[in-house]
A protein has these predicted regions:
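Extracytoplasmic/periplasmic solute-binding protein
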Residues: 124-128, 133, 153-205
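Short, solvent-exposed loop/beta-turn-alpha elements that line the ligand-binding surface or hinge
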Residues: 101-109, 187-211, 262, 274-283
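Conserved N-terminal structural module of periplasmic/extracytoplasmic solute-binding proteins
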Residues: 20-87, 278, 336, 385, ...
């Protein structure tokens, strides 16, 4: 054997041995500021599966756009984190893959969190956290929170005379006001038995929807829908009033907890109040979860990672570090969390909450309904006329989309 042949064989042997020893590498996109909450689980996974996991922080609401650009080039991640409405968008754009193990293990999760990421009977995300509107109250000002909206209205009227506020909420947003409408039987679109959203079954102009917005208009006329909370700075103003003890209670999501803790507010958490018709007030349920890129070349390892990240121990630790509530049933029932206010309230509130439809048409629904709610609060037009106009606008948009597609 000549020197060239020996050298060639040696080179081939080195290349082959390198391929055998090469470690699989997963690239995971996490939301900004959240990588640290899964760091411990990632380290354990790397040891058990003898692999490397690179966790990169990317703004969650830009991940679909980034995946669409980078995925086809082979530069994208294996795993992304998406809100449930964006899971629907990513699925429609053929950017993400079905997650096979979830077909068997979905019973370990709250049913409505599973429904929010299921399309045509297939699951496209592993739910990481759920969010819905809840009520925060200042324990220094209110020892026992009222249980009905009418009680909060009466309390708010008394406090306004003293220059203070009772219950604050961003009522001009459809996202908030839907919690009223839902309690009166209104809905956006019906969901068929197979899980398909029926765009021909529209329910934001029903008699119940009208009645719910009469409640809102009544509060507005009593000067309990505050202009100071309108606009992009409304949440900041609400925070200022609550943290300075000028407001007794606020309707907000669990994402506000971190700020309230930093402000040193002695707050309690409870479910939203009961409506005048006796039904619970309940808003949308938002689910965030992990999905697998269509272009991932490590799909099996990615599925192993997603199963591992939501094992009881890891999901429990993630909750304690992030205060993001996982829809993992065993965690919600963990004895160590029996007295955890946030866990208990989110679990109760999510029973009545409604999944946000994961369809492209929702971006237009938000816009139209925000304008409709503004008219209910600020204009004297009949509520049924306002909602009828909104319906016509939304239906026209849907028909145009259907024709163009």
């Amino acid at each position: 054997m000549n020197k060239f042949s020996k050298g060639l064989l040696l080179s081939l042997a080195l290349v082959y041995s390198h391929e055998i020893l090469a470690t699989e590498r997963l690239v995971v996109w996490e939301d900004v500021g959240r990588a640290s909450t899964i760091a411990s689980a990632v380290k354990d996974f790397e040891k058990i599966y003898d692999c490397d996991v690179d966790v990169l922080e990317k703004p969650m609401y830009h991940q679909v756009e980034l995946l669409e650009k980078q995925g086809p080039k082979g530069e994208g991640p294996d795993v992304v984190v998406l809100a449930s409405d964006m899971v629907g968008v990513a699925k429609d754009k053929n950017l993400i893959s079905q997650i096979h193990f979830m077909q068997v293990e979905n019973s370990q999760y709250l049913p409505n969190s599973i429904a929010s990421v299921t399309f045509d009977g297939e699951l496209y995300s592993v739910p990481k956290t759920i969010e819905t509107l809840i009520l925060f109250y200042n324990k220094d000002l209110l020892k026992e929170p009222p249980t009905t909206l009418e009680e909060y209205v009466d309390l708010s009227k008394k406090l306004r005379k003293k220059g203070k506020y009772g219950l604050l909420a961003k009522w001009e947003l459809f996202y908030t006001t839907y919690a009223l409408m839902n309690g009166y039987g209104a809905y956006i679109f019906r969901t068929d038995n197979d899980g398909t959203i029926n765009l021909n079954s529209y329910g934001l102009d029903t008699d119940g929807a009208v009645e719910s917005l009469k409640v809102l208009r009544k509060m507005s006329k009593a000067d309990l829908v505050y202009d100071c909370l309108s606009g992009v700075d409304g949440y900041n103003r609400m925070y200022e009033l609550f943290s300075s003890k000028k407001a007794i209670a606020v309707i907000n999501g669990p994402w506000a907890i971190e700020d309230y803790l930093k402000a040193g507010i002695n707050f309690g958490i409870t479910t939203l109040p009961t409506l005048p018709n006796g039904n619970p007030m309940a808003g949308f349920l938002g689910t965030k979860g992990y999905s697998i890129s269509k272009w991932s070349t490590h799909k099996d390892l990615a599925e192993d990672f997603l199963r591992f990240i939501n094992e009881h121990k890891n999901a429990l630790l993630r909750y304690k570090e992030s205060r993001q509530v996982p829809p993992v049933i065993s965690v919600l029932q963990d004895p160590s969390l029996a007295n955890d206010e946030l866990i208990q309230v989110i679990a109760q509130q999510s029973v009545h909450a409604v999944n946000m439809p994961s369809i492209p048409e929702m971006s237009y629904v938000w816009s139209v309904m925000d304008k409709a709610i503004w008219k209910v609060i600020h204009a004297g037009l009949p509520i049924d006329h306002i909602l009828e106009d909104a319906r016509k606008d939304i239906e026209s948009y849907i028909q145009t989309r259907i024709k163009n597609n």
